[in-house]
Amino acid sequence: RALHHLPRIQARNLHGDRLAGNRFAYALFDAGEIRITDLSDPWAPKTQRFPAGKQPYDALVTPDGRYYIAGLFGEDGLALLDTWQPEQGTRKILSGYGRGQEPLPVFKMPHLRGWAIAGGRAYLPAIGRHEVLVVDTGTWQEVGRIPVKSQPVFVMARPDGRQIWVNFAFPDYSEVQVIDTLSGKVVKTLSPGKA
């Protein structure tokens, strides 16, 4: 079967994840949208569009598949879409988390797949800051900040969720810090070499 019968879907600057039920969620940087395309019938895909904010990039789907979260390159904050209730549309979370502070230059944009979710909390890199943000995944409200050595890029959980490992952008890309999730403090700094 030829695929030329399928409708064209803009794919430039697309960042997506597979959802349950042959659905695919993706963010369109240029269009400022999050879309969910249901491919249950590959000959008649159905696409839902949701305004997301300025320049959505990259994304994360929570481990339970419920929430799709896109970063917003053009503004502080993130766009959250409940994929179990998409008719509610997107909502902004962590809006203005950098407001009132002088941001640092950004050397590397963090990837949302490089976030950690452990123990009902999301740990994410604060863009242009020397911090890891801690967010309650029940409310999607910020509940803390953990100071780290430099600008974090990837924030990954140990499989049991007891520790979070953080690597950094230039010039500190040769170091990794380990955060204890109970205390919310850096407990070790490793120097494995340039990444």
Where are these regions (language model features)?
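Predominantly soluble domains enriched in secretory-pathway, periplasmic, or organellar proteins
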Residues: 1-195
